């Protein structure tokens, strides 16, 4: 009887351990896959600083182009496409966190005017869904539904990202008006050079923290190097740690200066930002414009007919 109880207890503990392991794996995997948006969301309340700079540029130091395309004008309560293009050479390979080379990923943030937001799934047309692919967008904050983030996602498949946007209706949202509004966008390709805590990633150049002679270069077991620099003038030595990824530019016995690059810069990516404008158009204005154009066309037609009638009368009087 006691053996049976012991077996049941062991079985219960094993089941619980397996369940906990699975939960840890799922949580860890989710946090890694969503690393790009979470970095900005956890550190910055607003992704756009007062200077107009998007905060992603604090970690992605290289400047690269990005482009956004939206309609010139949209009607209220309408779904439209905001297309963000993040161009780069598809043949390039970036340094991964483990020091190996791999394909670049991309990410984007789009800052819409207040009232504009991600279109609900039931409002998105099949054509737009096909262009979107399997992308899953997030709100930057639960209370900032006009700021959307995406990434990291495979760059070879999603260098062009289609955001489905729903325009607001001033009839139901009193703080929205029929005006011209700015839209801001930021897009990166590849990993950053600095983490939000200020530490360097392995996707950047490493400089000497002291002047002197390189007395020893030791390769670490898991990759990377320990470079020992001896400063003869001060009689001290400094050890610079190089993570796996960057290639060494110095050798033992070499004399180096302070801040001299010890490695190459492996970064092949970068961040770019841009902006555009969109008009929330009043349907009554459109109807009024159409009515005006129609009246002008009718006036022209009547003028031509009147002129022809006058010419006929003149011709008749001359013949008479």
Swiss-Prot record:
Q: A GO molecular-function term, please?
A: electron transfer activity
Annotated heme binding sites: 36, 56, 59-60
User: Which cofactor is essential here?
Assistant: heme
Q: Which GO terms describe its biological process?
A: photosynthesis
Write out the similarity annotation.
Belongs to the cytochrome f family.
Where does this polypeptide localize?
A: Plastid, Chloroplast thylakoid membrane
> Which GO CC terms are listed, alphabetically?
chloroplast thylakoid membrane
**Residue spans crossing the bilayer:** 286-306
Q: What is this protein called?
A: Cytochrome f
Q: What is the lineage of its organism?
A: Eukaryota, Viridiplantae, Streptophyta, Embryophyta, Tracheophyta
Q: How does it assemble?
A: The 4 large subunits of the cytochrome b6-f complex are cytochrome b6, subunit IV (17 kDa polypeptide, petD), cytochrome f and the Rieske protein, while the 4 small subunits are PetG, PetL, PetM and PetN. The complex functions as a dimer.
Entries under Pfam families matching the protein: Apocytochr_F_C, Apocytochr_F_N
Q: What keywords does the record list, in alphabetical order?
A: Chloroplast, Electron transport, Heme, Iron, Membrane, Metal-binding, Photosynthesis, Plastid, Signal, Thylakoid, Transmembrane, Transmembrane helix, Transport
HAMAP family with a match to the protein in the record = Cytb6_f_cytF
Give the bilayer topology. Answer: Single-pass membrane protein
Cofactor note from UniProt? Binds 1 heme group covalently.
What does the UniProt record say this protein does? Answer: Component of the cytochrome b6-f complex, which mediates electron transfer between photosystem II (PSII) and photosystem I (PSI), cyclic electron flow around PSI, and state transitions.
């Amino acid at each position: 009887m006691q053996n049976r109880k012991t077996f049941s207890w062991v079985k219960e503990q094993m089941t619980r351990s397996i369940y906990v392991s699975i939960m840890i794996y799922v949580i860890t995997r989710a946090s890694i896959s969503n690393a790009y948006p979470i970095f900005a969301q956890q550190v910055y309340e607003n992704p756009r600083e007062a200077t107009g700079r998007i905060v992603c540029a604090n970690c992605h130091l290289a400047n690269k182009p990005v482009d956004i395309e939206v309609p010139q004008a949209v009607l209220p309560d309408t779904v439209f496409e905001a297309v963000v293009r993040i161009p780069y050479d598809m043949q390039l390979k970036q340094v991964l966190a483990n020091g190996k080379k791999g394909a670049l990923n991309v990410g984007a943030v789009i800052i819409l005017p207040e009232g504009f937001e991600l279109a609900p799934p039931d409002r998105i047309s099949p054509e737009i869904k096909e262009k979107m692919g399997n992308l899953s967008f997030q709100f930057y904050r639960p209370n900032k539904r006009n700021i959307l983030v995406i990434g990291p996602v495979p760059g070879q498949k999603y260098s062009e990202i289609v955001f489905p946007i729903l325009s607001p209706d001033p009839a139901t949202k009193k703080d929205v008006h029929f005006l011209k509004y700015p839209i801001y966008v930021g897009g990166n390709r590849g990993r950053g050079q600095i983490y939000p805590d200020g530490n360097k990633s392995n996707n950047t150049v490493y400089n000497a923290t002291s002047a002197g002679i390189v007395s020893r270069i030791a390769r670490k077991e898991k990759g990377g190097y320990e470079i020992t620099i001896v400063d003869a003038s001060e009689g001290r030595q400094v050890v610079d740690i190089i993570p796996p990824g960057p290639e060494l530019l110095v050798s033992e016995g070499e004399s180096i200066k302070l801040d001299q690059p010890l490695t190459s810069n492996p970064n092949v990516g970068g961040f770019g930002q841009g902006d555009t404008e969109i008009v929330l158009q009043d349907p009554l204005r459109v109807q009024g414009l159409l009515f005006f154009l129609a009246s002008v066309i009718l006036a022209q037609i009547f003028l031509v007919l009147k002129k022809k009638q006058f010419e006929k009368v003149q011709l008749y009087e001359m013949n008479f």
